[in-house]
From Swiss-Prot:
Stored Pfam families: SYF2 (PF08231)
Protein name, UniProt field: Pre-mRNA-splicing factor SYF2
Its job: Involved in pre-mRNA splicing as component of the spliceosome.
GO terms, biological process: embryonic organ development; gastrulation; in utero embryonic development; mitotic G2 DNA damage checkpoint signaling; mRNA splicing, via spliceosome; positive regulation of cell population proliferation
Annotated localization: Nucleus
The keyword Ribosomal protein is annotated on this UniProt entry: no
GO cellular component, one term: nuclear speck
Covalent cross-link Glycyl lysine isopeptide (Lys-Gly) (interchain with G-Cter in SUMO2), where: K142, K233
Subunit structure: Identified in the spliceosome C complex. Interacts with CCNDBP1.
Family under the similarity heading: Belongs to the SYF2 family.
Record organism: Rattus norvegicus (Rat)
Presence of the UniProt keyword NAD in the record: no
Coiled coil: 65-91
Length: 242
């Protein structure tokens, strides 16, 4: 008797299970690839940002130590210049407008700080007086940022000098700058003449000096110590001094 072979025909559900498993694996693989691409983009972005930070830090290290303070000061001065122009356009006095915006406490604190920073100790010698005048004049110099930007655009990379730069002596001041310098010098000369005018000579006065400088010294000595030496001088004139 011949053997009978049984053939099992798979159902539709059995065929669907391997297909579903393959689709699930493909979806997981696609998710992993997508996540990998996102991580790759984030890594490139982080690398770019780190490079920018390194460049910015290198620039900051090459700047002067007080660069931030200078920058803030220049920005404040630019704002002050803009306010002055606005007041001039309206026909107002900037100093008066500024005083209206400052409280009494701020004004007093500002005066104390100014006196502490640059105290007036009186005349000591000509070198100290000249140094004090130099500091006062340099504080009055206002930066011209428009001219600065024009020169920087004109010279490009050569504007920031190196060991091979040859920019010295090539700058030609404008007529406005020359006029401003002349006006400032005229003001200095006028002020100097006002405070150092020659006193008229009195022929009837007693001559107790050997030159003009000694005469000024004697006047100062008389002003401070005259009341203490008056009796001694009288005794010397009468011949009764001990």
């Amino acid at each position: 008797m011949a053997a009978v072979t049984e053939v099992v025909v798979p159902a539709d559900g059995a065929e669907a299970r391997p297909l579903a498993a393959e689709e699930l694996a493909a979806q997981k693989r696609e998710q992993r690839l997508r996540k990998f691409r996102e991580l790759h983009l984030k890594r490139n972005e982080a690398r770019k940002l780190n490079h920018q930070e390194v460049v910015e830090e290198d620039k900051r290290l090459k700047l002067p130590a007080n660069w931030e303070a200078k920058k803030a000061r220049l920005e404040w001065e630019l704002q002050e210049e803009e306010k002055k122009k606005e007041c001039a356009a309206r026909g107002e006095d900037y100093e008066k407008v500024k005083l209206l915006e400052i409280s009494a406490e701020d004004a007093e604190r500002w005066e104390r700080r100014k006196k502490k920073k640059n105290p007036d100790l009186g005349f000591s010698d000509y070198a100290a007086a000249q140094l004090r005048q130099y500091h006062r004049l340099t504080k009055q110099i206002k930066p011209d940022m428009e001219s600065y930007e024009r020169q920087r655009e004109k010279h490009g990379e050569d504007f920031f000098p190196t060991s091979n730069s040859l920019l010295h002596g090539t700058h030609v001041p404008s007529s406005e700058e020359i006029d401003r310098m002349v006006l400032d010098l005229e003001k200095q000369i006028e002020k100097r003449d006002k405070y150092s005018r020659r006193r008229p000579y009195n022929d009837d006065a007693d001559i107790d000096y050997i030159n003009e400088r000694n005469a000024k010294f004697n006047k100062k000595a008389e002003r401070f110590y005259g009341k203490y030496t008056a009796e001694i001088k009288q005794n010397l004139e009468r011949g009764t001094a001990v």
